[in-house]
Regions:
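The feature marks the mature, well-folded catalytic cores of soluble enzymes
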Residues: 1-201
Length: 201
């Protein structure tokens, strides 16, 4: 796609072709740039952010406050208040007073969405020209579920993500986590090369 509107139209057409009602999304900064969530909603598709921070701010109808930790500005009390307001089936006596309980609440809701999604939409940390693979890096594992569970997977990435070969991808992966969060490697690093081919094991 040459412009944002073209990218949105292509994604919308794919969703329409499979009669998609729900799209699970792993974190995609380019998705923010082209306002893909707004486009999908206007076209009758429910986009669900699956990164925990992105999910929280989506419920609050706020933009991300930070590129890596999008809900860093919120207290656990604000997150609990958001869940009470948006998770309408939440029992009134359910205690939401610590991060682990909040995580469990979000995980339960997101699992339902992962299992019912028609389309998964991901970004790509790298596009490997040598193999046609995408590299996905997360600390939550949500990208793997967005890629692997729905029957259709759409990758939204721009040209600067292309690297020549796997060796280059591995070199950049070592730098990526350190520069973003100070980790040696992120918890989940996945390479996806499309559906199984006849010469795969």
């Amino acid at each position: 796609a040459r412009v944002c509107s073209d990218a949105c139209s292509i994604i919308g057409d794919i969703c329409k072709s499979v009669d998609a009602k729900t799209v699970t999304k792993s974190k995609s900064m380019i998705g923010e740039e082209i306002a893909i969530n707004d486009y999908l909603e206007k076209n009758g598709v429910d986009p669900v952010e699956t990164d925990l921070g992105e999910y929280i701010i989506q419920l609050r109808d706020e933009p991300p406050s930070h590129i890596i930790v999008p809900a860093v500005h919120l207290s656990k009390e604000q997150v609990a208040e958001t869940f009470r307001e948006k998770h309408t089936d939440l029992p009134a006596d359910r205690v939401l007073d610590n991060p682990r309980i909040l995580l469990d609440e979000a995980r339960g809701k997101l699992r339902e969405k992962f299992l019912s999604a028609d389309v998964g939409l991901s970004g790509a940390n790298m596009l490997v020209a040598e193999t046609g693979s995408i590299a996905l890096v997360t600390n939550e594992g949500n990208a793997d579920l967005s890629v692997g569970l729905p029957r259709v997977h759409i990758v939204l990435a721009s040209i600067e993500k292309v690297v020549p070969c796997m060796e280059d991808a591995w070199t950049l992966l070592r730098v990526l986590a350190r520069s973003a969060t100070g980790q040696d490697l992120s918890v989940y690093t996945s390479f996806v090369t499309g559906p199984k081919r006849s010469d795969d094991l």
